[in-house]
């Protein structure tokens, strides 16, 4: 059979069946997108337009702060990209999402303990234990998403078959 091109869409004949995306993977991908979108909305609501401008201005005062600020934006975009790739069954997407969570948690932990720029990204707390507890509470939704991607047999099978 010959491929037909209709504008940007390409119609191809395929003899193999496509595996349906498990509901748990769909929920995880949607949760990633919704959590990151809600994070942005909450920041805008808390700081307002003027506060966002001041935050960006403060974030780009030195090269180190600019690097941290831009890295955090890149991290958010990578997480959203992973969400879309998860639905397509890309095996690497769940591992990349795990890596982004380890990176974010490690930086938050280090910045909160004074190794980095606490005024930009840090978790307030009196002791290491209190900071760690707050960090785990903050990362709880992301840990649940990771569990949805790695623990259920349907999720594991979906990524193995793709």
From Swiss-Prot:
GO cellular component, one term: plasma membrane
Record Pfam families: YbjO_DH-like (PF10767)
Native organism: Escherichia coli (strain K12)
UniProt entry tagged with the keyword Membrane: yes
Protein name: Inner membrane protein YbjO
Chain ranges on the Cytoplasmic side, renumbered to this chain: 45-66, 116-162
Segments traversing the membrane: 24-44, 67-87, 95-115
Alphabetized UniProt keyword annotations: Cell inner membrane, Cell membrane, Membrane, Transmembrane, Transmembrane helix
Main location: membrane
Keyword field contains Nucleotide-binding: no
Periplasmic side: 1-23, 88-94
């Amino acid at each position: 059979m010959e491929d037909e091109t209709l504008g940007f869409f390409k119609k191809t004949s395929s003899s193999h069946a496509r595996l349906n995306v498990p509901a748990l993977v769909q929920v995880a991908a949607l949760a990633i997108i919704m959590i990151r979108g809600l994070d942005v909305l909450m920041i805008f609501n808390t700081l307002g337009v003027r506060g966002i401008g001041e935050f960006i201005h403060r974030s780009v005062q030195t090269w180190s702060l600019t690097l941290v600020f831009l890295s955090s934006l890149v991290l958010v975009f990578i997480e959203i990209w992973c969400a879309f790739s998860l639905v397509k069954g890309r095996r690497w997407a769940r591992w990349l999402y795990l890596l982004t969570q380890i990176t974010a948690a490690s930086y938050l932990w280090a910045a909160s303990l004074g190794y980095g720029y606490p005024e930009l990204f840090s978790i307030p707390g009196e002791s290491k234990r209190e900071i760690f507890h707050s960090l785990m509470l903050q990362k709880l939704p992301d840990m649940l998403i990771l569990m949805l991607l790695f623990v259920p047999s349907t999720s594991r099978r979906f990524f193995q078959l793709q």
